[in-house]
Amino acid sequence: MAADVSVTHRPPLSPEAEAEAETPETVDRRTPEQELPPLDPEEIRKRLEHTERQFRNRRKILIRGLPGDVTNQEVHDLLSDYELKYCFVDKYKGTAFVTLLNGEQAEAAINTFHQSRLRERELSVQLQPTDALLCVANLPPSLTQAQFEELVRPFGSLERCFLVYSERTGHSKGYGFAEYMKKDSAARAKSDLLGKPLGPRTLYVHWTDAGQLTPALLHSRCLCVDHLPPGFNDVDALRQALSAVYTPTFCQLASGQDGQLKGFAVLEYETAEMAEAAQQRADGLALGGSHLRVSFCAPGPPGRSMLAALIAAQATALNRGKGLLPEPNILQLLNNLGPSASLQLLLNPLLHGGASGKQGLLGAPPAMPLLSGPALSTALLQLALQSQNQSQSQSQKKPGILGDSPLGTLQAGAQPSNSLLGELSAGGGLAPELPPRRGKPQPLLPPLLGPSGGDREPMGLGPPASQLTPPPAPMGLRGSSLRGLPKDSGPLPTPPGVSLLGEPPKDYRIPLNPYLNLHSLLPSSNLAGKETRGWGGSGRGRRPAEPPLPSPAVPGGGNASNNGSKAFPMKPRLLSPIASNRLPPEPGLPDSYSFDYPTDVGPRRLFSHPRESNLGAHGPSRHKMSPPPSSFSEPRSGGGSGGPLSHFYSGSPTSYFTSGLQAGLKQSHLNKAVGSSPMGSSEGLLGLGPGPNGHSHLLKTPLGGQKRSFSHLLPSPEPSPEGSYVGQHSQGLGGHYADSYLKRKRIF
């Protein structure tokens, strides 16, 4: 159904009548988008000459029919009268691609060598076909040549660039051509310029066939009419409005496949002159309350093809910068990211917005709530709960590497713990099947930072922070010593200010070295001496001491029976240099855990070696390794006599050439004379000196030049020719060892 619109147009008038008809009413009826001032004839001539020169500036020629053995030099000699910028010869196809100085030389070369002969072969010379020519349409009429070059130059090297001007007025017709040296540059320019807004217009870019583009075809016969009234669909009214001078041969409104109008129309005239006259009369014409904007389309295609091209170009321009799928909303994005990533994404700008510490000109901002919007607060809360539920369910379903997760044993009604490590228990590690204590859950991590329970007092660690119900020992660990023992589950008061490592010894001598100072290793609150408290507390008395389990004595003279009752004993000398006897374990405490192994199996068995017969009379103990002599540590008030040196420790560089026992004895006498310890300053760092029955030297790696010696792995070096004398110019043991190594290295 045709819309009820009013069309206002003027019949063709002579120049004299046209001047007389310029009335305010006529000016109001025709309001073009942009009025351009008239140009003088000289400026019109210059613009037209520039367009013609650029249009003919095709300087690339193609030579066909060359002999198969032609060389590049022969082509240069053939075109010696011209200035060659580029020449490529394809011997297999017998062609040459040549770029000359300008289009005039290219035309002259074509006229001279076309259908000429070279070695009795006829040549064919013509312009190279190009596929990098673009037509940029819907430009503002006031755009100059320099501005157009600036618009298209950033995408690549230009071969030609020019605007098309009207032969009557000299003004731009609103489109121009740009030819690039490479096709990929032209494709990039088309992709970036299509749909780009330039002033009040939107650019349209089309590929152009340079072979079909002639000087006569530079001027378009098609017009594009936009700024139509909303919902305008009367084709006859539009045809009548633009038939004031000439009647168009084609007039159609643009519509999509669904029949929806696109808001513009395309008209085609018989000649370019008719189209130009219709454009000048119809531009700014009032139609249905709107002023039409009439512009030139790209030249070449007919009106029907141009209409389809403009519809496709408009769709591309509207979807500029968008993907094929619709943009997802914020909820879909957060759902795809997951709860943890969503929380981090939402909270980062809120938490770190003022992390820089910079304040505005008016000072610090007032205190504002973290989440001002209730919807955002609710969303974050739901995400947090969902993330927590997922993490808990995953941790309960998936067993850990060492067995079931400790989270799986937590009851549903248990309250969350306030501490990450929980409360220290009275014993060692927790069994996986430990039931939670009433009111408080079990700690998530066992107290692996140090011993607890009965081991704390002799080590100088102080009493434990609190006590939980001791867990039942696994069947593989508990033995007959646990049967029949009563359970103890009474809580103890938590002493204030006690760290995980407990209290340091009161008579500990702080080293003078600032890097080994105790202040840099332990908290300052633990440096002050405190009263040593046992397991007893208010309302609870100390249990009577029970005799320790009997075990064979150590050859070194120390009593290691209590230490041998545990799988991995913590020595009393580990954190204190004071010699003291270990308190017997109390019943029901994890201190009474033990292995049910024979008396001939102990920690020394872990380090056993077939090289035991070399020690002679100093036979190794069947239960524990012999500690080093007392000369390896500081004098102690209550220590036992030192035993023979273990064959696993060699304390000096001489152990490279002698057995461990002999080298250790030599080094011990040397240390007595010098007054230093072979273990270095680290021996007294935390009281790690080995006691009479301690094996702290097993917990260390030998320092720099101190290595374990095994005479059966490396051959014994030859004795030094200089004996034990080391003079000023003597090579000593090091030089002799190097010579011996060079002699014997081939056996490896």
Swiss-Prot record:
Signal peptide: none annotated. Residues 59-130, 132-210, 221-299 form the RRM domain. Keywords: Acetylation, Cytoplasm, Nucleus, Phosphoprotein, Repeat, RNA-binding. The modification Phosphothreonine is found at T31, T469. Ubiquitous. Detected in aorta, brain, gut, heart, kidney, liver, spleen, uterus and skeletal muscle. Residues 1-42, 390-505, 525-647, 672-731 are annotated as: Disordered. GO terms for cellular component: cytoplasm; nucleus. Disulfide bonds: none annotated. Residues 307-401 are annotated as: Interaction with PTBP1. Residues 675-685 have a biased composition (Low complexity). PROSITE patterns: RRM (PS50102). It comes from the Eukaryota. The modification Phosphoserine is found at S6, S14, S480, S576, S626, S630, S716, S720. InterPro entries: Euk_RNA-bind_prot (IPR050502), Nucleotide-bd_a/b_plait_sf (IPR012677), RAVER1_RRM1 (IPR034633), RAVER1_RRM3 (IPR034635), RBD_domain_sf (IPR035979), RRM_dom (IPR000504). One of its GO terms (molecular function) is RNA binding. SUPFAM superfamilies: RNA-binding domain, RBD. A motif (Nuclear localization signal) lies at residues 45-60, 743-746. The modification N-acetylalanine is found at A2. It is found in: Nucleus; Cytoplasm. Pfam families: RRM_1. Cooperates with PTBP1 to modulate regulated alternative splicing events. Promotes exon skipping. Cooperates with PTBP1 to modulate switching between mutually exclusive exons during maturation of the TPM1 pre-mRNA. Interacts with PTBP1, RAVER2, VCL and ACTN1. Part of a complex containing RAVER1, VCL and ACTN1. This is Ribonucleoprotein PTB-binding 1. It comes from Rattus norvegicus. The gene is Raver1.
